[in-house]
A protein has these predicted regions:
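N-terminal pre-domain/capping segments
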Residues: 1-27, 32-39
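Hydrophobic faces of well-ordered beta-strands that scaffold small-molecule active sites
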Residues: 4-10, 27-29, 55-59, 91-93, ...
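Catalytic cores of alpha/beta
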Residues: 11-22, 65-82, 119, 126-141, ...
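Active-site-adjacent beta->alpha loops and helix N-cap segments on the catalytic face
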Residues: 13-15, 33-56, 70-75, 95-115, ...
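A short, flexible beta-alpha/helix-coil linker loop
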Residues: 62-64, 98
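C-terminal alpha-helical cap/extension of soluble enzyme domains
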Residues: 63, 87, 169-242
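Ordered, amphipathic secondary-structure segments that act as subunit-interaction surfaces
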Residues: 78-95
Length: 242
């Protein structure tokens, strides 16, 4: 799948093992995918040692908005340090102001703590008034990529705006489409947006573990691997957009 990137969201050690396959280019390590992804535990970060060179930790201390106070920032600094100590390749960060713009001061602070790590700007960008302007800010901050759904609930719904974001970014920064990305819509997304990097949980399709006590059903590793295989097959189709 030369020229295309597949990133998989992982919130368990079982899925870490699944994503060791070379079909997965990058891992977004997190917890609580049902809440949009929060910071993974220190234990999970350490257990990523076998795939640490392609693992990037989500740094999000709580659910809800991305307007952070001083104590939230303290937590994020510590979590960035934990990701570095675990030998991970990068971190996924974001922060906004009450006015729904990127919080440049907070981002600069976090990036300084993450010196030497690859930086991804997460879907905070989808909550902003002007995501296109945020692309320029991210470039100035030295961020490597932006994960976005194009301001919509799913990347497919946001495809038109994703195309605008890709055009604005050019070759300055990678735009990665995420939220609801499946083997069924990969071709359409690539064709409509020009984007060549995709983020997926790999859990679509409804196959989950039993949850008789209401403690939270999760996608089985076998199901996620099956979906990874499907997405990889799509990338390799002769008619997939170049």
């Amino acid at each position: 799948m030369t020229g295309f990137t597949l990133e998989i969201c992982v919130d368990s050690v079982a899925l870490l093992d699944v994503c060791a396959t070379p079909m997965v280019d990058r891992i977004e390590l997190c917890s609580a995918l049902s809440a949009g992804g929060l910071t993974p535990s220190l234990g999970l970060m350490r257990c990523a040692y076998g795939v640490r060179e392609k693992t990037h930790a989500m740094i999000r201390p709580r659910a809800g908005d991305f307007v952070y106070g001083a104590r939230d920032i303290d937590v994020m600094r510590a979590d960035i340090g934990a990701a570095r100590d675990a030998g991970l390749a990068g971190v996924v960060i974001g922060a906004a102001t009450q006015a729904r713009a990127l919080d440049i001061d907070v981002l600069r602070d976090l990036i300084s703590y993450a010196s030497g790590l690859c930086i991804t700007l997460h879907r905070v960008v989808d909550t902003l008034i002007d995501p296109l302007a945020a692309i320029d800010c991210a470039v100035d901050l030295g961020i490597s990529r932006i994960l976005t759904s194009g301001k919509e609930t799913t990347a497919l719904q946001g495809a038109d705006f994703l195309a605008d974001m890709k055009q604005r970014a050019g070759d300055r920064i990678e735009i990665m489409a995420g939220a609801g990305v499946t083997a069924q819509n990969l071709t359409g997304l690539a064709d409509k947006t020009g984007i060549r990097a995709f983020n997926s949980s790999g859990s679509y399709g409804g196959e989950t573990s039993d949850d008789p006590f209401g403690l939270g059903a999760v996608a089985t590793p076998e199901h996620v691997l099956s979906n990874i295989l499907r997405m990889h097959a799509v990338f390799n189709r002769p008619n997939f957009p170049n």
